[in-house]
């Protein structure tokens, strides 16, 4: 009797894990975006390009810091609210949400993170 209960509990745990699991689209901390939607690597590349820009009359009016601030505002993107479709933008769900898809990787929607996703 105890073995049947243990097997049923394991099966229930496995099924709930499969249903609530979200496939990892990108691994590592480098895939995380800052508040402007720009990765750290892209930000470094933008700063490097600004430093290497040739000086002309249009650029002389702005320092590198002002140009970076202006470029940040143009690259902002809005996030996708909960229950919104995220098929083509899996990393753009709003804060405390994640893009969750069905078993075949379609019908993706931004939904509340599961308990284990919040913990890391």
Curated annotation (Swiss-Prot):
Major place of residence: secreted
Positions annotated as propeptide: 22-63
Keyword Manganese: no
UniProt tissue specificity: Expressed by the venom gland. Not found in the whole body.
Signal peptide: 1-21
Disulfide bonds: 79-94, 86-99, 93-110, 101-108
Keyword set, alphabetical order: Disulfide bond, Ion channel impairing toxin, Knottin, Neurotoxin, Potassium channel impairing toxin, Secreted, Signal, Toxin, Voltage-gated potassium channel impairing toxin, Voltage-gated sodium channel impairing toxin
Biological role stated in the UniProt entry: Probable neurotoxin. Strongly inhibits voltage-gated potassium channels (Kv1.1/KCNA1, Kv1.2/KCNA2, Kv1.3/KCNA3, and Kv1.6/KCNA6, with the highest toxicity against Kv1.6 (74% inhibition at 1 uM)) and mildly inhibits sodium channels (Nav1.2/SCN2A, Nav1.4/SCN4A, Nav1.5/SCN5A, Nav1.6/SCN8A, and BgNav). Induces activation of protein kinase A type II (PKA-II) and MAP kinase Erk1/2 in primary nociceptive and non-nociceptive sensory neurons. Does not show cytotoxic activity. Does not have an impact on Ca2+, cAMP, and NO signaling in the cell types analyzed.
More about this protein: Negative results: Does not show activity on potassium channels Shaker, Kv1.4/KCNA4, Kv2.1/KCNB1, Kv3.1/KCNC1, Kv4.2/KCND2, Kv10.1/KCNH1/EAG1, Kv11.1/KCNH2/ERG1, and calcium channels Cav3.1/CACNA1G, Cav3.2/CACNA1H and Cav3.3/CACNA1I.
Family membership: Belongs to the xibalbin-1 family.
This protein's name: Xibalbin-1
Native organism: Xibalbanus tulumensis
Upper taxonomic lineage: Eukaryota, Metazoa, Ecdysozoa, Arthropoda, Crustacea
